[in-house]
Amino acid sequence: MSVPIKFVWFPQIIGFVRNTLGAGKCDLVMGTVAGDEVMETTSPYYYTSYVIVYRKDAGWNFTNFDDPRLKPLHFGVIAGTPPGNLLVRHGLMVNAKPYQLTVDTRYESPSQEMIQDIADAKIDAGLLWGPLAGYYVRSGHLPLQVTVLASEPQAPRMAYHIAMGVRASAPQWRRRINAAVQKHHDEITAILTEYGVPLLDEQDAPLVK
C-alpha cells in the first residue's frame, strides 16, 4: 500500500478504542470482531473460534461437553468469555479455574498462563480464544491438542469473523484496506496458519485438521 508502518501498543482495557483509534494514535486496530459496535470495521480477513486445549497424553479426546469423562476434570476459562457459559450449561463450572479477562497485557498474559498450566498438569484443559491458544501452543512447541468449540443452540456463539477497526470518518481508508485484504488473502491465510491460528470455513469446519 506504500504507506509507512508504525506499531502502537496499548492494553486492551476499558477505553481502548477511545485512547487509540479515537485519539488519533493509530489508524487501524487489528483483530477486532467484524461489526464491532464501537468502531467501523473492514471486511473480515479470517474466521475463527474459541477452542478447548488439553494434553495429547490426557487419555481422552474431546467430542462434546456431554462426555461423562469430563465431569471430574479441572477446566481453565477466561472470566466473562463465551465458553464459560458452556461450562455452566453442562455442570462443569464447579471445578473451573478462572483467569482474568481485563489485564494490562504489557505485564500479564492470562491466556499464556493458562496454556502453561495445562502443559504443567495444573489443570486438565482450558477454554480460550483460538488465535491466542494456537499461538502459544505453536510458539512453545507444547504437546497440546487444540480443538475448535462448536456453538450450541441458545448459547453464546463460539465462532467470529475477524476484521480490522477504522475510524468512521475514514471511508476511503477502509476501502483501501478492504482492497489490500482481498488482494493478499492467500498470503494472510498462510501467515495465520504459520502462527497456529485455527481457521474455519463458513460451515464452521476447520480448514486445517
Language model: regions and residue ranges:
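Solvent-exposed, polar/charged alpha-helical surfaces in well-ordered, non-transmembrane soluble domains
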Residues: 19, 23, 85-89, 112, ...
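A ligand-binding cleft/hinge motif common to bilobed small-molecule-binding domains
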Residues: 14-16, 22, 30-40, 89, ...
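Solvent-exposed coil/turn segments that connect beta secondary-structure elements
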Residues: 33-35, 47, 55-58, 80-81, ...
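Extracytoplasmic small-molecule ligand-binding "clamshell" domains
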Residues: 1-32, 36-38, 104-108, 194-195
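Extracytoplasmic
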Residues: 2, 16, 23-24, 47-49, ...
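Flexible hinge/capping segments at coil-to-helix
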Residues: 55-75, 89-90, 94
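Periplasmic-binding protein-like
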Residues: 47-57, 138-181, 198-209
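Ligand-binding clefts/hinges and TM-proximal coupling segments of bilobed small-molecule sensing domains
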Residues: 4, 10, 82-103, 178-209
